[in-house]
Amino acid sequence: MKKMSSGEIRQMFLDFFKSKGHAVEPSASLIPVDDPTLLWINSGVATLKKYFDGSVVPDNPRITNAQKSIRTNDIENVGKTARHLTFFEMLGNFSVGDYFKKEVIPWAWELLTSPKWFGFDPKRLYVTVYPKDKVTKELWQKTGVPDDHIVEAEDNFWDIGEGPSGPDSEIFYDRGQQFNNVAEDDPENYPGGENSRYVEIWNIVFSELNHLPDGRFVEQPHKNIDTGMGLERLVAVIQGTPTIFETDLFMPIIKATEKMSAGKRYGVSAQDDVSFKIIADHARTVTFAIGDGALPSNEGRGYVLRRLIRRAVLNGKKLGIDHDFLYQLVPVVGEIMKSYYPQILANQQFIQKVIESEEARFRQTLDAGVTLLNQIIADLKQDGKKEIPGADAFKLFDTYGFPVEMTNEYAQDEGLQVDMAGFKKNMAAQRDRARKARGDRQSMGSQDKVLMSITTPSKFTGWTELDHKHASLQTIVVNDQLQDSVSEGTAQLIFDETPFYAEMGGQVADHGEIKAQDGTVLADVSDVQHAPNGQNLHTVTVKGKLETGQQYWLSVDPLRRKKVSLNHTATHLLDQALRDVLGEHTHQAGSLVEPDYLRFDFTNFGQVTPKQLRQVETIVNQKIWDALPITWKEMPIEEAKKLGAIAMFGDKYGSVVRIVKIGDYNTEFDGGTHPTNSNALGLFKITSESGIGAGIRRVEAVTSKEAYEYLTQQQDWLSETAENLKIDQVKNVPSKVTQLQADLKAEQKTVAGLQAKLAAQAAAGIFDHPEEVGGLKLIAKQVQVAGMNELRQLADKWKAKQASDILVLGTEVSGKANLLVAVNDTANQAGFKAGDLIKAIAPKVGGGGGGRPDMAQAGGKNPAGIPAALSEAKTVISQKA
């Protein structure tokens, strides 16, 4: 068997299948861009679904790839076993209705055993087959695998319910008894058994059957091949390491961690080794995930990242690392993987910044959290208890940022567990408190019992009309009670059909009127939300009698709808422009579309520069002026994916979705309203950009008339400034301001010089005649200086001159009092502290203060009290002495 690096092994696999006519598919992003059902890409085939389900026809039906993947269902086992990882690479070769068993089996054997390729010893290879799959067994025999190296196993059948299925065949490598964790005569000591001697290196799935809803299996007309070979395991076998962690994929990370630890070394302590392995795995995972655009947060994949980073930081603490360190491993990961993933080093600074920020955030509460957790565990052990109360686990989560899974893992290491039911109860109580704090307004997720009971359908007609003259009133709800009629007050109404848009996806609801057939206004619509069963629920202020079963004229405010629609389109253009300028790591994190402005939240670490904002703004305006047609249609979700429509993570989509397309520039899954052409927006102007949380930025902007008014207001302010500066043309304002700033700086320098002279003059006499009070020399005087800074300068001169034992100074600045007290070592030894003395005299000027034992200061609102404060200082000193 050849000795190769991990990079060479990966490349050899791809080169082999390229020689067999396969197209090399680049590794896709870890973040699924066309599959809302997945949190992460978790296998080599996950990115190829579009080919196997027939929604996209590949240019070449033979495909090979090395796909980065993340699986997080066994996080707690990472580091504690020889095989669990959260990030891994899956090597694979695939056939979409092209070749099948008689081709793939000989190829697999050739790649593994040929001296030209991996060069495995055939005697150390074993294969497993499904007992009923006689064809596969015969093909392995023809390939040269002896019968005693072919194992029949009932679990060699791939089936996930309805859909494609079929037998599979696994290939194992015999590492020898020296690598085993069970005895040679153990019943599990066979290829496919629970042992560490026989390592599975490849799985070949023969997708030849279709599992029907009635449970029957029928043969598929087009047979497919799906294979998976874990790179990390393969590298461990080829490099002859005890586990995957000793390979060149992990050891550089472990060595770098050793250098930052408190003298810890890998391979010395089993307990320390667990921490080294956890850090190495998690460093890889978070580096690649953030590189692909994921960011730490409290939900979804962001929560997974936060949990991994904090788990790594906690294990770093176990190794004696008390500073931010995980971000320093990013370039190590990048260097290891640069041959196939150069983008890690290219994006290194951004990835490091995200991790460092998250580390620093957690480290603020880490020590206190660990101390509390250790105390909880010690108390439980002393009382003979085995379960951490849910309330304590919640406190660790809510106050100290400890994911409950991490607390539970920490507890398990101590032979304890967390009361998860109690934790969930506390979480539910917190959510309930949050709901109450938000008030009683019923939201889209309202589960009110009365509304839940309403199942009458309601159709939205507002895509094509703003007036619907014959809407039948189906339901009236007043104070959570169903009624047949209403004549005043506030009510909630459901019609069989309505043009009113219900708030959704950040777009606010339509407003308007409900009228009688003669045009008499009977109610004003102030809000529309989705009822629990999907109907549009209109909140109205009633002006006339409304009755169920009657028909009414529903009229949407056309101007409000138009303005909201324009701003909604602007969010789509803004979203795309941000991706164009900042990169694909940027994605929408929230939005609000109002009639008069729009707000758009997006992921990005660091402030967006003025230059970048100008680029974004320019792109959006250019797309507006390009007069791009805006079209929308409903279509099957798979067809929408083929169009490359952007799906918002966290949103759930049915089998039929609505797609909004702005020319060829932007295509998104969307349920909002839009104009028919981008030129309807007229103008787009960003009014602010700010940070609202870790990794989340917010842009506010205006369009159309509001954008014009905003620019007009800016122009008015600029003109007013020019007038005040006595400038004829506003274009000269910047140069005039620059000149004034230079003049001001020069004047400030002059003033500072004069103040220094005044301070020197003031100091000239105040130190000359100290008085003796209580056996100590005291200088207590009111001086005329510019402020507290000058008082401190006087105190420095007093200290240098050793003019007295205690100094008390007061000055009036802008109608307020400043006091300063300084004491030397002699006064300190006599029991006088500056902080105590300042607290005693500050009330005389109507203020308070504090400071160090040798110097303290105070401020107050009553400068007239300065003489009394100085006198009080003498009294306090004389009494204490």
UniProtKB/Swiss-Prot annotation:
GO terms for cellular component: cytosol. GO terms for molecular function: alanine-tRNA ligase activity; aminoacyl-tRNA deacylase activity; ATP binding; catalytic activity, acting on a protein; transferase activity; tRNA binding. Its EC number is 6.1.1.7. Keywords: Aminoacyl-tRNA synthetase, ATP-binding, Cytoplasm, Ligase, Nucleotide-binding, Protein biosynthesis, RNA-binding, tRNA-binding. Consists of three domains; the N-terminal catalytic domain, the editing domain and the C-terminal C-Ala domain. The editing domain removes incorrectly charged amino acids, while the C-Ala domain, along with tRNA(Ala), serves as a bridge to cooperatively bring together the editing and aminoacylation centers thus stimulating deacylation of misacylated tRNAs. Belongs to the class-II aminoacyl-tRNA synthetase family. This is Alanine--tRNA ligase.
